[in-house]
Amino acid sequence: MAANISLQPTSMRDVTKMERIGVHSHIHGLGLDSNLEPRASSQGMIGQGKARKAAGVILKMVQEGRIAGRAILMAGPPSTGKTALAMAMTQTLGSDVPFVMLTASEVFSLEISKTESLTQAFRRAIGVRIKEETELIEGEVVEIQVDRSVTGATKTGRLTLKTTDMETVYDLGSKMIDQLQKEKVLAGDVVSIDKASGRISKLGRSFGRAKDYDAMGADTRFVACPDGELQTRKEVVHTVSLHEIDVINSRTQGFLALFAGDTGEIKPELRAQINGKVAEWREEGKAEIVPGVLFIDEVHMLDIECFSFLNRAMENELAPLVVMASNRGITRIRGTKYKSPHGIPADLLDRMLIISTNRYEEDEMREIVKIRAEEEDVRLSPAALDLLATMGIQTSLRYSLNLIAPSSLLAQRRKSPQTDVEDVRMAYKYFCDVERSAQYAKETSGMMFGETEEINGGMEVDA
């Protein structure tokens, strides 16, 4: 008896890529024109015109390498876009200029000292652009022949490469044959071979072989057959940070320590040797220093020892631009009894350029909510948008933005194509803001644990 075999095609499931939306994922730059004038709404940045222009001037100086070893302080109330400005600076600088983000509380660790943690952050924010000339063989593979010995122990072969102008046959050893097999190089592929290291890079498939197969994978890339000589000299530029050079030279396992993350304390003598070697490369024209940016958020959480270290470290020859952010007013310097603006000692404040941020107006708040809703794929009705903007003024911008996702979910539950006022009101009813939560804490203070304070006789009572 024949088995019943289903001939229906199997159903294919769409696997959607999960994309996390960050708090600042809508920011793509500072939103300035060529004259460093802030646009009203550009690259995800709204308002804060003076602060954005000041940040643009600083970035221009960073790109020209003229402002290393300086300190900038972004001071302003919470929810005024200090971290957003730092993210915009990251996007504007690009990947070639090192940008290190650090929260002040990350400095305190049981494994390494505070000064070592700050030193590593400083060294990560300094890039070294190393130039080297390499000889490359680039061409289209015509034929690969592999000859095996009778015993099968050794392999030899020949590789035929061509450009539009010439064709050459190269003899191959066993290691090169293994490399070709590892990269799955076939006739018709365009390859690049580094003569010094023997590394083979597969650039793509030649346009001339585009019709060899009826179906090809999505990752198949077609490139033109190279022209001119097969052997060319190219200048390759690598950008690494000083910290990466420190780690590679401090451990026996070398660069593997970079991936392990367990760098530990690095000796000052080793750093001095590396600084000397980098200075030697600069004199020979082999390398150049790329001063980056170190951003320290919540800087008031650092203590007096960290601040005294920063005083000295910023005057070092190899120092990045240090950007700090604080939302404190006159507050106590951690580790002392003294108060100071922003919780930073006066001698360090004197070395800083201070950028102040102000609270957003209602129109700016509305535009920010609109951009965030678009980023989160939420359709807001005009009335809901106005309500969220008003909430942002009365409570805080973060609370208003945090209500977008719950409101959208409530709208989906009632099968509505867009989020309306009633959804926002329902979310407002479910989730308290800071003021309502504080009011609730006061009303229920008798049932909640509070702080205790000592009175006569050392007896403790509820505050």
Swiss-Prot record:
Q: Where in the cell does this protein reside? A: Nucleus
Q: Report which superkingdom the organism of origin falls in.
A: Eukaryota
Give its E.C. classification number.
Answer: 3.6.4.12
Q: Which SMART domains match?
A: AAA
Q: Which molecular-function annotations from GO does this UniProt entry contain?
A: 3'-5' DNA helicase activity; 5'-3' DNA helicase activity; ATP binding; ATP hydrolysis activity; DNA helicase activity
Is Nucleotide-binding one of the keywords? Answer: yes
Quote the catalytic activity from the record. Answer: ATP + H2O = ADP + phosphate + H(+)
Give the CC-aspect GO terms.
Answer: Ino80 complex; NuA4 histone acetyltransferase complex; R2TP complex; Swr1 complex
Q: Does the keyword Metal-binding apply?
A: no
Q: Which GO terms describe its biological process?
A: box C/D snoRNP assembly; chromatin remodeling; DNA repair; regulation of transcription by RNA polymerase II; rRNA processing
Q: What does this protein do?
A: DNA helicase which participates in several chromatin remodeling complexes, including the SWR1 and the INO80 complexes. The SWR1 complex mediates the ATP-dependent exchange of histone H2A for the H2A variant HZT1 leading to transcriptional regulation of selected genes by chromatin remodeling. The INO80 complex remodels chromatin by shifting nucleosomes and is involved in DNA repair. Also involved in pre-rRNA processing.
Family recorded in the similarity comment: Belongs to the RuvB family.
The entry's protein name is: RuvB-like helicase 2
The scientific name of the source species is: Cryptococcus neoformans var. neoformans serotype D (strain JEC21 / ATCC MYA-565)
From the UniProt record, report the name of the gene that encodes this protein.
RVB2
